[in-house]
Amino acid sequence: MSELYTFDESYKRLLGLDIDGVDIAGIKVQGLKNASPMKDILDLSGKVAIVTGGSRGLGLCIVSRFCEAGASVVIADIAVEFAEAAVDYFSTKGKKVKFIKTDVRFLSQIQNAVDFTVQEFGKVDILVNNAAIWKMNKFFDLTEETWDNTIDVGLKGTVFFTQAVAKQMVEQGQGGKIVNVASVAGLSMESSYGLLIQYVAAKSGVVGVSQSLARELKPLGININCVLPGGMVSPGAIHSAPTPELRKITNAHPTVPVTDPDDVARVVFMLATEISNYMHGATVVADGGARLMIQK
């Protein structure tokens, strides 16, 4: 390993940071800690992750990136056929991936997923709350069922999966990483064409919850941060395409970038590694510049 990455005394002096014991504005500065090479920072060997909604689209890309970095992964999803196919695929690659059918609307199933993960792999180090549903509709066409399902999956599931995993992390005493997948729709109604009020409500809630929980979880050694993707090519997007009537509304807006979900998965991956050690309650936008194009 190169001496450059050890922050030895010579390197500290080079940086002008050989300052152990110095008092700055009443804060005792202990100087730089030893640093790890990037290859070690990005290495998830020995880590165990749960990814909700991990059977397809963005979730599957996240699972793939975690596996590539050496993590063991549990897919918590309701799509049995797709999840089992994913497990079979990763097994042929020698990766450790398990699946448990989980409807994140129900706390009992959330706890079952956490217990299953601990039983299979001994612990939980990383949680990615990715499960969500969305459907385009005008406000006057919104039904109670659509509202409840969207909020329960996207917001309630995120809150209570975070609670269950955070309790497990505290019990383990090793801290951990929690990454919540929100959306740029949670920041701007414009980005959702005004046709996703229930989805906007859920994702706005995820952003707020992530920021609020960061204060409580930071002293426990748990980093919780939030990724806000823009439009992605995914099965969910294809199956939720607007009707011809709604298409007239979406076509009236500027064309915005639609990305490969792996572009977003890389950002999620970053927040699940030691790169995010100094990040608490951050909201990281990964929308290909879409917000810049639709702002007036």
Q: What are the roles of these predicted feature ranges?
A:
Residues 218-223, 279-281:
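Short, small/polar-rich loop/turn modules that mediate ligand/substrate recognition or access, typified
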Residues 3-40, 188, 269, 280-296:
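Short C-terminal tail/terminal secondary-structure segment
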Residues 253-264:
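A conserved structural motif in NAD(P)-dependent oxidoreductases
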Residues 167, 171, 215-216, 277:
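Alpha-helical segment proximal to the catalytic Tyr-Lys
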Residues 138-139, 143-151, 238, 249:
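Substrate-binding pocket helix/loop in short-chain dehydrogenase/reductase
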Residues 162-163, 211:
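A short, exposed helix-loop element centered on a Lys and neighboring polar residues
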Residues 179-205, 210-211, 215-219, 231:
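Catalytic loop of short-chain dehydrogenase/reductase
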